[in-house]
Amino acid sequence: MLSQIRPAITLLVAFTLLTGVAYPLAITGIGQTLFPSAANGSLVTRGGTVVGSLLIGQKTTGEGYFHPRPSAAGDAGYDAANSSGSNLAPTSQKLKARITADVAALREAGATGLIAADAVTTSGSGLDPHISPAFAYEQVERVAKARNLPETQVQTLVAGLVEGRDLGLFGEPRVNVLKLNLALDTLK
């Protein structure tokens, strides 16, 4: 019987060491060597203090900043420990009521014309750090007015921070809200 169990135990130990120790250490080493910023969360610091991550959205308030898309992560939104979408069906009355309220709030804040879809819809994770260029441009007037800046200067800033499709064909053009707001803080 021991002759039958020995190969099984040997394989268990070998694969445990291979997949539980060697592989994770190798991948961590490769990540830290080739992509140290991304492997550590793409954290952004200002004055030695971490102000956010380029990979995780955060709630931004205040008229002088660009706002991210709505979040369904946690009760108050943007809870990284509770990342999720709303899981509401497209026919859900609760979803319809929330979107209607969001559209009304945007209209009250001065939005005119078409409203970008991501201005009123949540992402799958609830923590998307990006918004569409259309949603960013919709906010230019409000942000410029709050900061006493020319709209053209803020529009130029947005245009310069639009990220294209990955590898030229995957995804949609987008703007990282944290990058945009930090760049906005440098304008005079």
UniProtKB/Swiss-Prot annotation:
Membrane association type: Single-pass membrane protein
Protein's job: Part of the high-affinity ATP-driven potassium transport (or Kdp) system, which catalyzes the hydrolysis of ATP coupled with the electrogenic transport of potassium into the cytoplasm. This subunit acts as a catalytic chaperone that increases the ATP-binding affinity of the ATP-hydrolyzing subunit KdpB by the formation of a transient KdpB/KdpC/ATP ternary complex.
Record Pfam families: KdpC
Gene expressing this chain: kdpC
Key word DNA damage present: no
Quaternary assembly: The system is composed of three essential subunits: KdpA, KdpB and KdpC.
InterPro entries for this protein: KdpC (IPR003820)
Protein's recorded name: Potassium-transporting ATPase KdpC subunit
GO cellular component: plasma membrane
Keyword Transport: yes
Domain of life per record: Bacteria
Family, as annotated: Belongs to the KdpC family.
